[in-house]
A protein has these predicted regions:
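N-terminal switch/interaction subdomains of large nucleotide-dependent motors and GTPases
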Residues: 2, 6, 18, 29-33, ...
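Transmembrane helical cores of multi-pass ion-transport proteins
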Residues: 11-30, 40, 88-95
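Extended, low-charge hydrophobic alpha-helical regions
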Residues: 31, 399-657
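Short, hydrophobic/aliphatic alpha-helical segments
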Residues: 32-41, 81-97, 298, 408-425
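Glycine-rich oxoanion-binding loops at beta->alpha junctions
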Residues: 62-94, 277-292, 296, 300
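Elongated alpha-helical scaffolds
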Residues: 83-117
Length: 657
């Protein structure tokens, strides 16, 4: 036997012993997990809202720098080590893939529920059961026809802007003031509307698609939109002033149109079509020359069929480009997977994957015109098709990071508008919805039957305590929107969220100065004589609020009967101070519409003024902040389900090998 054979004792090949696995197991409420969750929540909370702080992310070894407060870009850029954080991030990213918006809200509510349930000291399974009950109550409230849902008139510019402006204005990384936010929001609206097919056209109705091009080192005011699709044409100098001439079809049903051939294979002579082909060449022939000759035959065939544009996802050989231009045919290459879809949408061409010269006419696309478009000292080919309402949104900004953030929020805003076509409903934004839901939870859970908490194996006090925890988490997410030291108050008539300046304690006219609530649907003057004001979360900085006089009336702190829990409950309402303006007049209660919880007749979860209800007409001329109904409901579901999933986990087991 050979000395080097596997069976020899003298073999020089020795097996490396497998390193023994190290399995560690720790409870989910391990201090390391709690610290990681708090840090993660702090990062997200400080990024939330228009006054949030930007996060600068870079790999320790260098590389690309990301400056953002967007959840999607944030989660894509950071690396998480704790399994619990990976689970939360995966749930948020799954929500964003479908809905695009609401990532920070989902993550914050998830983290708040997990942390508060851990701190409650109650069994996690009990927390999960109560969370599911409260979740169902909230969803029933949201889905009521006469409840919180606000109908969106798709023909109203003000109503649609109420959905767009909060998305664009919520990201400070865009570096825009109020006027610029309004300007960009209007551009997004115009581009979206221009991309909707006409109902009188023969074209199949599809979701609007808007191309977005970013231009760096130019002011935001240079942003605009162009009908059609723009494709970069670096081969055409910007100083070229002549019209782009392309052959067209002069007769037949396609008369006056420019035909387009669209390829997703290389036209540089290295097509994958010939990889497995075996061939023999005569000494005087070369494979590259033969391939180029075949492609030129293909060009002659396309020109004979009236093709004026050849677009390729990959590379077109320079000699083939010259051959095309000599015959008046424009060439576009290196389109990438993204741009080839845009060309396909506007031309309605079939993507060709072969160099076969027998190209059927039905596989060719059509354009109305091709023009040169010089924009910011760069040349583009402007593809126009009057039968296909495609639109290009050109966004400008001074810096690369601000431009990337602006492009991202505009894509999210366009997706939000697309969702509004299918589900034209909205919800109060800017934290008002969370305050209303928190009030509904506190009022409704006290009216539930005793059998409910008996079935889940807890006392009434424990049930009310966990319901209060859920309501507090909703309020905490809402209060994370503003970070300038304002106090948060709510009125007992509509339960919307209002902001009180930090120096409002000494301001005797603070009630008149508030104007509208955070979302803009309610004003301080509506039924002013009936309002009671609750200070939510206490006064910041340790200050105490004394009596405040307004119009001669002395306003004292107290606690409303509606916000007081059952005496048997260990939960105190010390976090909420009440400023009573005037006792409510029961004779005027018929002016309000009661929002009732389904299945529990007579239980008021809030009140909506009938004169200023959630009607489409009431949205006109108001600077409102609204959230998409579909996005917010799904974000709420994902947050609660993810929190419950984490609470169900008993141990984390890590196998390190």
């Amino acid at each position: 036997m050979s000395a080097f054979s596997p069976g020899s004792h003298n073999s020089q090949v020795s097996a490396t012993p497998k390193e023994q696995s190290h399995v560690s197991s720790y409870q989910q409420q391990h201090p390391a997990n709690v610290r990681a969750l708090r840090v993660f929540r702090s990062i997200l909370s400080s990024s939330f809202g228009p006054s949030g702080f930007l996060k600068m992310i870079q790999n320790q070894s260098g590389g690309h720098l990301t400056l953002t407060s967007s959840s999607q870009r944030l989660l894509q850029s950071i690396s998480l080590s704790k399994p619990i954080l990976k689970l939360i991030a995966a749930a948020v990213e799954g929500h964003l893939k479908i809905w695009s918006d609401g990532g920070l809200y989902t993550a914050l509510l998830t983290c708040a529920l997990i942390e508060e349930c851990w701190e409650s000291g109650l069994h996690p399974v009990l927390c999960v059961s109560v969370n599911e009950i409260v979740r169902d109550l909230c969803l029933q409230t949201l889905n009521r026809q006469d409840g919180l849902r606000i109908p969106i008139d798709l023909a109203s510019m003000d109503a649609m802007l109420s959905l767009v402006k909060p998305v664009i204005g919520s990201k400070p990384g865009c570096g825009m003031d109020t006027g610029q936010v309004t300007f960009i929001s209007s551009l997004v609206m115009q581009a979206f509307v221009s991309s909707i097919p006409s109902p009188n056209s023969q074209q199949v109705l599809t979701l609007p698609q808007v191309q977005i091009i970013g231009v760096e080192s130019w002011p935001v005011s240079g942003s605009h939109f162009v009908l059609g699709v723009l494709m970069a044409a670096p081969d055409i100098p910007p100083s070229f002033k002549r019209d782009v001439r392309t052959p067209g079809v002069h007769t037949g049903p396609d008369g006056g149109c420019i035909r387009v051939a669209l390829y997703d294979i290389s036209l540089a002579g290295d097509s994958e079509e010939f990889i497995d082909v075996r061939y023999e060449l005569s000494p005087e022939l070369h494979a590259e020359d033969a391939t180029l000759a075949a492609m030129k035959d293909l060009v002659d065939h396309l020109v004979a069929h009236g093709v004026g544009l050849v677009a390729c996802q990959r590379v077109i050989h320079p000699s083939v480009k010259g051959y095309l231009r000599a015959r008046g045919v424009q060439a576009l290459d290196r389109l990438s997977l993204l741009h080839i879809r845009e060309v396909q949408r506007i031309t309605d061409a079939e993507i060709l994957s072969s160099l076969d010269t027998n190209v059927p006419a039905s596989s060719l696309g059509h354009l109305t015109d091709i023009r040169q478009h010089v924009m910011f000292k760069k040349s583009y080919l402007h593809l126009i098709n009057t039968a296909s309402p495609q639109c290009c949104l050109v966004l400008c900004h001074y810096t690369e990071q601000a431009l990337e953030e602006l492009k991202h929020v505009c894509q999210v805003a366009l997706h939000t508008l697309t969702l509004a076509l299918k589900d034209p409903w909205a919800l109060p934004g800017a934290g008002c919805l969370e305050f209303i839901l928190a009030h509904c939870i506190r009022r409704q859970v006290r009216e539930l039957g005793d059998s409910l908490w008996q079935d889940i194996g807890c006392t009434k006090a424990q049930f009310l305590r966990l319901a209060e925890t859920f309501a507090t988490c909703l309020e905490a997410v809402a209060m994370a929107i503003n970070k300038r030291g304002e106090q948060h108050i709510t009125d007992v008539a509509s339960h919307h969220r209002w902001l009180l300046p930090s120096d409002g304690v000494e301001d005797t006219a603070w009630l008149q100065g508030k104007g509208r609530c955070a979302c803009g649907l309610k004003t301080a003057e509506e039924h002013a004589e009936e309002r009671e004001w609750n200070l939510v979360g206490g006064v910041q900085g340790g200050a105490q609020r004394g009596g405040i006089k307004e119009n001669g009336a002395h306003l004292q702190k107290s606690k409303t009967e509606g916000d007081r829990y059952d005496p048997s409950s260990p939960v105190s309402n010390s976090h909420k101070k009440t400023v009573n303006k005037k006792a409510k007049d029961s004779s005027k209660s018929d002016k309000c519409t009661e929002i009732l919880m389904p299945g529990n007749g007579g239980d008021i979860c809030g009140t909506m003024d009938a004169d200023s209800g959630n009607s489409t007409a009431s949205l006109s001329g108001k600077n409102l902040i609204l959230d998409s109904f579909a996005v917010k409901c799904n974000a709420f579901r994902v947050a609660v389900e993810t929190a419950n999933m984490v609470l169900r986990i008993g141990h984390t087991i890590e196998d390190i090998n």
